């Protein structure tokens, strides 16, 4: 009974967060400092930043920061002790941000962006859904891809450059 009650509370809380996502306030944002701020929330050795160049992206800094935190946390949880890689590049007026992990991969990729679907015990199933909503509301895209260089997942965010 307690487990069902806790699951129902997670569901209600998740639904409320999905329903009240504020409209983004996009503006030019320097990506390197935003990424550094997100990385600081985790053990430094667990996140390898593979890009040194700074680019500007047109985004809501607070919302994009939350997306980065969510994707980094997912990667770290999936990869066990393996570090997560974070990198970005700019090309043709678009900025691509990639976060790669060394976890088991994509078990059921068709459901990953379905609200309340989760592969984690105790998960609410809203993190990826919220992340995609945030990115798409800012004119971008978010996709999860199987890594080509071994096991794991690569989250790819594409947003307009500033």
Predicted feature descriptions by range:
Residues 1-29, 33-44:
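Conserved DHp (HisKA) dimerization/phosphotransfer helix of two-component histidine kinases, i.e.
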Residues 48-56, 62, 91:
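Conserved catalytic submotifs in the C-terminal HATPase_c
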Residues 74-79:
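Short helix-loop "hinge" at the ATP-lid/N-box region of the Bergerat-fold HATPase_c
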Residues 83-93:
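Short beta-strand/loop element within the Bergerat-fold HATPase_c
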Residues 106-116:
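Short conserved segment of the HATPase_c
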Residues 127, 131:
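Short alpha-helical Gxxx[C/S/T] motif in the catalytic ATP-binding
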Residues 135-136:
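Detector for a conserved hydrophobic position within an alpha-helical segment of the HATPase_c
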């Amino acid at each position: 009974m307690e487990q069902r009650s806790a699951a129902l509370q997670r569901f209600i809380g998740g639904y409320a967060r999905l329903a009240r996502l504020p409209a983004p306030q996009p503006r030019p944002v320097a990506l390197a400092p935003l990424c550094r701020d997100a990385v600081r929330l985790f053990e430094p050795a667990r996140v390898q930043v593979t890009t040194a160049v700074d680019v500007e992206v047109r985004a809501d800094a607070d919302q994009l920061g939350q997306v980065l935190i969510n994707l980094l946390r997912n990667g770290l949880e999936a990869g066990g002790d393996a570090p997560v890689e974070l990198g970005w590049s700019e090309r043709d007026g678009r900025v691509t941000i990639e976060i790669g992990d060394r976890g088991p991969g994509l078990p059921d990729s068709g459901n990953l962006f379905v609200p309340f679907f989760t592969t984690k015990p105790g998960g609410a199933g809203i993190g990826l859904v919220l992340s995609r909503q945030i990115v798409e509301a800012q004119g971008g895209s978010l996709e999860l891809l199987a890594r080509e260089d071994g096991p794991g997942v690569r989250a790819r965010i594409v947003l307009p450059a500033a």
